[in-house]
Design a protein with these regions (language model features):
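Conserved phosphate- and dinucleotide-binding cores of soluble alpha/beta proteins
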Residues: 1-126
């Protein structure tokens, strides 16, 4: 079984927000976690979270240092994140490796900024 869900944003640890964009409520979790778990627990199964790398005409990265909205799917439940720049397999990876893989599938215009944010988070705990 392979499940595919969408997201509004994903942070550098792999946490997924699929419910709220800024102050605008976009929808409930709608069983996303159930589908994610089903895909991951099925023999040879996978769970994909798919999203465009940017929003607002390319001016806003959807892979972010920290979520602006609530966590819909916890990082421990996330298997694979997919953008138009590739797939980041996160299951079983360290936080540092998750961060590296997510930056690699972010829009190229935002990778340096995300790398700096990741460095700040690692060194300052911010």
């Amino acid at each position: 079984l392979v499940t595919i869900n969408s997201a509004l944003e994903v942070d550098l640890t792999g946490q997924v927000n699929a419910a709220q964009s800024g102050a605008a409520y976009m929808g409930g979790t709608g069983g996303q976690v159930d589908f994610v778990r089903a895909g991951m627990r099925s023999p040879d199964g996978h769970s994909l979270i798919a999203l465009a790398s940017t929003a607002k005409g390319g001016t806003l990265s959807k892979i972010v240092a920290t979520l602006a909205g609530p966590v819909t799917t916890a990082r421990t439940e996330v298997d694979v994140i997919v953008t138009e720049f590739g797939a980041a397999e996160l299951r079983g990876q360290s936080l540092a490796e998750r961060t590296r893989r997510l930056i690699a599938i972010a829009h190229p215009d935002f990778r340096e900024e995300l790398d700096r944010a990741a460095h700040t988070i690692r060194t300052r705990g911010v």
